[in-house]
């Protein structure tokens, strides 16, 4: 190296970095890694010019550097040791080169070689990893090894590297605290060294990446609480350091909302979704960064897709909040329990007094104007369970707004499954809104809207390719007709003398419900059209419910023909008996339909007597 000016070595290194940043699509189609290979060649030249690694660092067995190798590898160092003297300085510069070679090989899908270089980097830094000069490089190397092992699906190994990085960061901030040297500064002239502010920004970004990768690892390990905590920390830090991609940040915040929704933490979910809306609105207003080299305006399809995905998260929020309220207020037959409603009203003030101040501190994104913008979105949406129709309607309208927004991208032509799920959510919004409605005619109209949006899907779908989805839709349409029939019967019961139009309407609804329940049950038959002796666990409850409702529907058909009525009662009895007999042969099924089974047993006992009386009456007339 004595014969080569240091400035030339630095130029080679900077040229290698520039080539490393060239995007793949800018390379020739047949040589997508051309720039990466050119960068690698320059890095190897710099490595050769630096000379061999210090002997005691280079000769140590690699096994010592693996995860779990004790204090000298991933454990925390006992003290801060700065790399002083020419030998130590050369070791650190070589570590920088090994790091970039490692990343280069990973980028070209040569994982084993990439791992080897990253492990060499860590070995060279072993003594100095907590120092001002080396901490950032050490954490970056371990982060990349964490990603590498994660890609190999060795998640526990990835976890060890990433948790070690987190611990190193925390120890450094506690014991040293000053912004550390960025690895690239090893090859910069003194006058081009970074400011303290820029160093701090880069180091905090490295740590933010560490938290982001840990969130992914914990999610993979099904440690969902931890994953949510790290995801939230990542998102918060990205905003604090103004280092985020609006579309990516927004979709991550919306995804985090789903964790809170499943935990029934609706205030936190609302905050995440409101923040997602605000940040997503920045798309195109923020210039590209080194992390996001292309302006977002160049990816309109991704923009519209993410917008649709965020809309779907809002739909889930509205739907789950309404359904949770329904569960809290319904009686044992699924109707509104006024006593429960009154109890929840009494709790409302207490909820407002206690939760607003406590929980708002737990999840909060942004400060100043950003915080105000997020709050402005939040204030338009309730996080409390709706207790009456007006409150439920507000959530319904918000959910429906996002249904229309989601359907703009997720159209049936190209996104069949997604489109159907959005339509099913729309139907579910109408269904749960009907629970809060006291006017039975208006409830009927809501179920009619559900049928109007679901029935066309059964025409568009090929049952051979979309069997499960078809079953879901058939069952849901049947249930909507079933609910409408029950409501029409209740309306007729209030009249002294129902006219023929109402009777015809009830029978038509009955017939439609039977049609779709039968289509659902027929879909369970084998290719020889034989109904299974053992019904699969995934469809057991819906199959039993369908049988029970078919039995009940036959018993509800209104006819003036005694012979036809007797036939209907016999068919009804046949379906009730099926349920009882099946549960006797398969006791596990009884747990799925306890209420329906008891009613079926009762009907199996009562119907034969009723039918016998009917026969006697027919004989006498």
Curated annotation (Swiss-Prot):
Keywords: Cytoplasm, Cytoskeleton, Developmental protein, Differentiation, Hirschsprung disease, Neurogenesis, Phosphoprotein. The keyword Ribosomal protein does not apply. Residues 54-65 have a biased composition (Acidic residues). This is KIF-binding protein. It is found in: Cytoplasm, Cytoskeleton. One of its GO terms (molecular function) is protein sequestering activity. It holds the Pfam family KBP_C. Residues 51-75 are annotated as: Disordered. Its main location: cytoplasm. The keyword Transcription regulation does not apply. GO terms for biological process: central nervous system projection neuron axonogenesis; in utero embryonic development; microtubule cytoskeleton organization; mitochondrion transport along microtubule; neuron projection maintenance; transport along microtubule. InterPro entries: KBP, TPR-like_helical_dom_sf. The lineage of its organism: Eukaryota, Metazoa, Chordata, Craniata, Vertebrata. Activator of KIF1B plus-end-directed microtubule motor activity. Required for organization of axonal microtubules, and axonal outgrowth and maintenance during peripheral and central nervous system development. It comes from Homo sapiens. GO terms for cellular component: cytoskeleton; mitochondrion.
